[in-house]
């Protein structure tokens, strides 16, 4: 009896050790990626760019966090203590674009998600690996769904409050206010402060309309990252679907997809984008993302097609076919997960490329007219001859593109089995 108990205890201990030592494919790739310090720290640089994009209103906005207005100052209904910054984040008088509303929402939802993630990660040791992975997947899906619903409700609600000039009110000595670090909005126009040199008030000076350049570059981070990510997501989705169909089914499906790819690559991509842009009278950020997404999928499609052609001849796929699994299950459970590694690397480089395309369109005056794009600031610098208006957005574009390319190179090497150390 004692021997049976010892054997059972040994079996449980061996199983626990095996589960603790087990490394998934993602763990292997992550450990390998960490061996490339330049790419690893560049990834954190990209994360910081995203954090800066989210926290832009915390750093620069012409609305105070806190305001205490005494009786007799301003409108009668303004007397008392106010926290206008929190409502201004979703006020369409201050933020017209849905892009800004989305990033402003992340100021509140990201910390909540981070806390939940830490609690979930802390419970990892108490759960079986399969249960932890299931719980993590559900958390990501429910979090994305919840944030999408909240954003849709807020955006469609069209929330507006009566406009209040908080900068003018704060000039009264009896009014107590606490503003962000910079009291400017990227839309503020001050014709009395046109083309000012950098100083303690305007860190990078002002442009032709008196708008603070540093604030516009700060909010321009949102545009660049969003256009890069969303445009790449669009053309990656198209490329994966078409490339997967062509590679798996072959025959006439492959022929049709390849002919479509050949037609698309006959046209220079940038000129094709310019042509499509010409059909839009008043382009928005979403139009630019859609145009880039609809024209950049050919490379992904060819890459996925090649991966599917290689993988469908592998033994594990042939075994799945022999077992009678449905084609949908074979494609989505066995082939596609193994084909997405090179796609991820290509998408990382694609984000940098999309940012450059957007900056080029804005530089040529073909981007959104009201958006604080880095390309627009470059145009102002070219027309006015001010060095800071050229160097500041140029450096921002350079740093962002370099960081993304370094991350892509590290991911490419980490996914290559021949380079594993």
List the predicted regions and their residue ranges.
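Gly/Trp-centered helix-boundary motif
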Residues: 1-236, 240, 354, 370, ...
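Alpha-helical transmembrane segments of integral membrane proteins
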Residues: 130, 151, 206-421
């Amino acid at each position: 009896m004692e021997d049976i108990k010892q054997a059972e205890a040994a079996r449980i201990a061996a199983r626990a050790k095996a589960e603790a030592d087990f490394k998934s494919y993602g763990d292997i790739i992550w450990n390998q990626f960490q061996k490339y310090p330049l790419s690893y720290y560049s990834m954190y640089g990209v994360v910081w760019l995203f954090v800066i994009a989210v926290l832009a209103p915390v750093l620069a906005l012409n609305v105070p966090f806190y305001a205490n207005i005494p009786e007799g100052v301003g409108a009668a209904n303004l007397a008392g203590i106010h926290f206008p910054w929190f409502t201004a984040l979703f006020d369409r008088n201050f933020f017209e674009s849905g892009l800004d509303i989305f990033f402003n929402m992340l100021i509140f939802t990201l910390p909540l998600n981070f806390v939940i993630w830490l609690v979930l990660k802390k419970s990892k040791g108490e759960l079986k690996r399969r249960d932890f992975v299931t719980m993590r997947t559900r958390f990501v899906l429910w979090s994305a769904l919840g944030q999408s619903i909240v954003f849709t409700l807020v955006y469609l609600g069209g929330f507006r409050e009566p406009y209040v000039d908080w900068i003018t009110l704060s000039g009264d000595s009896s009014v107590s206010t606490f503003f962000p670090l910079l009291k400017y909005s990227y839309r503020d126009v001050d014709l009395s402060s046109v083309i000012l040199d950098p100083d303690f008030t305007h860190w990078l000076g002002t442009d032709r309309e008196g708008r603070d350049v540093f604030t516009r570059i700060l909010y321009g981070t949102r545009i660049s990252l969003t256009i890069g990510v969303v445009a790449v997501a669009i053309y990656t989705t198209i490329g994966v679907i078409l490339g997967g169909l062509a590679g798996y089914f072959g025959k006439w499906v492959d022929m049709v997809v390849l002919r479509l790819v050949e037609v698309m690559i006959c046209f220079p991509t940038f000129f094709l984008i310019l042509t499509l842009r010409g059909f839009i009278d008043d382009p928005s950020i979403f139009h630019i993302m859609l145009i880039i997404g609809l024209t950049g999928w050919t490379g992904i499609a060819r890459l996925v097609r090649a991966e599917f052609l290689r993988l469908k001849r592998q033994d594990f796929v042939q075994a799945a076919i022999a077992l009678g699994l449905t084609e949908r299950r074979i494609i989505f459970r066995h082939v596609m997960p193994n084909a997405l590694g090179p796609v991820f690397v290509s998408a990382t480089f694609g984000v940098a490329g999309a940012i450059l395309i957007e900056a080029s369109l804005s530089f040529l005056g073909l981007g959104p007219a009201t958006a604080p794009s880095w390309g627009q600031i470059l145009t102002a610098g070219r027309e006015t001859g001010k060095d800071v208006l050229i160097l500041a957005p140029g450096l921002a574009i350079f740093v962002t593109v370099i960081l993304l390319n370094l991350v892509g190179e590290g991911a490419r090497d980490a996914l290559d089995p021949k380079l594993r150390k």
